[in-house]
């Protein structure tokens, strides 16, 4: 291979966030990688590109010009374009004087409908383009325009940061379009790879794409040269410094092909998070994001302090739990607030433990930092009334709790480490403290009975005054989870790959010997969807969490009692 780093030359690195995910805040991964590379390698010129936001910008412009014709509800194409434009305008500017929930729900539902239809269409077009089928000329131009800013920059290495599975096909298309125009190296990384049990399979197995017309296999290696399935900072830095093929063996977390074989380098973690500077969002146009306020993502720890949930694979992402020091957190938060003029933060930590949450909240108060923030936490009794009031005083406005089920037996089988009675009290106390609660609920965990399903429904009814947003879903069997590795412990008698399973998105069907089967659970779930969508201020807040934070901040009131 042609080595990346020419002695004496400055390497140009593009870090790209591909479509498509919610366009409500800038991507954290590219911002952190950009900051780390700028600090640690003066010989690397780094630029981050949010092609996801550009994708939405271009889509909305093309829709308004009639280049893309979409029909929502019973509207014609012109009316649809007008209504979607009105929705975006409202979501960005229409809540500044008053956050009218009824109007918000109306407009955000229009925007969600647009997202669902447009993204499904473009995903199909991306697959067609990849496997060589014809696509409308307007679509071809749209895709090529997306990568033009990256090509104009002229990088030697392109890093694609994938957070969600919805980005995977687009990431491969971006890589293909870039390599068509210029012979450059492409590395794929991000949290999506981190939760994969066997990311090296992306090189070993063909990528199968199916459209309405045909199914075709592609070789991943013709578009992507390297994978970084673990932490990317040190790996990307070393990759940029590689001067020959031999140097690749010294790049931690790297997966690549050599002599027609897949090579996997040992994993590496940065134990001292103080070595990683705060995220750099300077390459992103923050005013373009679609929401009432600019909300910046922030990470104060890596890994999960619990790490025992039987359904989860997030323990693959960061390997072990580490925390950024409180003083360093404050320094980075101050910088974000002062440099970007932003007062809204979304903590992306897997969850913040009670003791750390107390220390962080008290430190924010002591330093007089005025922010509004959302964070993930576990509903345990340590979150008592005094602590929840402290969190509210520090600027906490939304806490996202992993409740999952109201059945204690199911929670024990999940190894959640929570008690449902304690969780219920935490939600009530948080509401009285002035906080808004977003809770996560998972239906259909293996062995869950109809009575336990209904137990969770009753819990939601009983506590609806303290549940301000609900993020609901059906159980998905994830490769690498304890359930998948030890199915006998969960009454699973058979696991097989689903027909629609792909190397980049493993999907499993399964059978159980007791409790609700997947089909029975789905029937129950759909039967109760209307009730579930009545929980909280708007059923859309579960998807648009940055909007929930803005709404919560607009309704600030002193804690009760």
In which residue ranges do the predicted regions lie?
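Conserved, mostly hydrophobic/aromatic
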Residues: 37, 254, 304, 347, ...
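Canonical Radical SAM [4Fe-4S] cluster-binding loop centered on the CxxxCxxC motif
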Residues: 291-327
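Structural recognition of alpha->loop->beta junctions
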Residues: 201-236, 390-399, 455-477
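Conserved SAM/AdoMet-binding glycine-rich loop
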Residues: 13-20, 157, 187-188, 195, ...
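C-terminal accessory regions of radical SAM enzymes
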Residues: 14-16, 23-24, 32, 49, ...
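Conserved Radical SAM active-site core
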Residues: 11, 54-62, 66-155, 180, ...
